Amino acid sequence: MYGIYIHDELTINDTELSMDKLCSGIVENQSKCIAVSINSSNIISDLNMSVRKIIYKFGTNRYLFYYYNSKWYTDIHHILSLMDLSLGSFISELQKYYPECDLTMWILRGDGMCIHRKLIDLETMTKIILSFNSNFTRCFKAECIYHMAIVYILIMYQIYILSLIRINT
């Protein structure tokens, strides 16, 4: 993938907190409700799992990814919060896409709060993004086309260079 990877823990923590705030308190409220109703050993076992967080900056957009068991995931709440939805539509879309969550786990946020994340893989993330017609989606599509064009140009340039080498030999 072309873009910038951000590994700085402070930037990741700030981004994660601000993305959770975009979700109108839903992430924190759901986490608190779930935490009250389950055995705390479930939370502790999830927190002991190794989950790496990374930000991927692609064009003007930032994505927070969670790396677990050799796979990349993102929080469904974060993706839907980028779609300019009203609170009612946000909740409706969450209910629609919850069955596609690949993984749910407790992850410690930078401010010390345990958050119950509903994680989706990159394929599901792309499917969700492309199913909307928001400013974010239009920007995402334009940036994908731009990067594909750059890759195409680089491949054609390599073919041209190889043809020159072949002619000279």
From Swiss-Prot:
Transmembrane regions listed in the UniProt entry: 145-165
One term under GO cellular component: membrane
Statement: the UniProt record of this protein carries the keyword ATP-binding: no
Subcellular location as annotated: Membrane
Keyword Transmembrane among UniProt keywords: yes
Motif (Cell attachment site): 109-111
Glycosylation: residue positions: N13, N29, N39, N48, N135
Superkingdom, taxonomy of origin: Viruses
Major subcellular site: membrane
Assigned keywords, A-Z: Glycoprotein, Membrane, Transmembrane, Transmembrane helix
Membrane association type: Single-pass membrane protein
Protein name as annotated: Uncharacterized protein L536
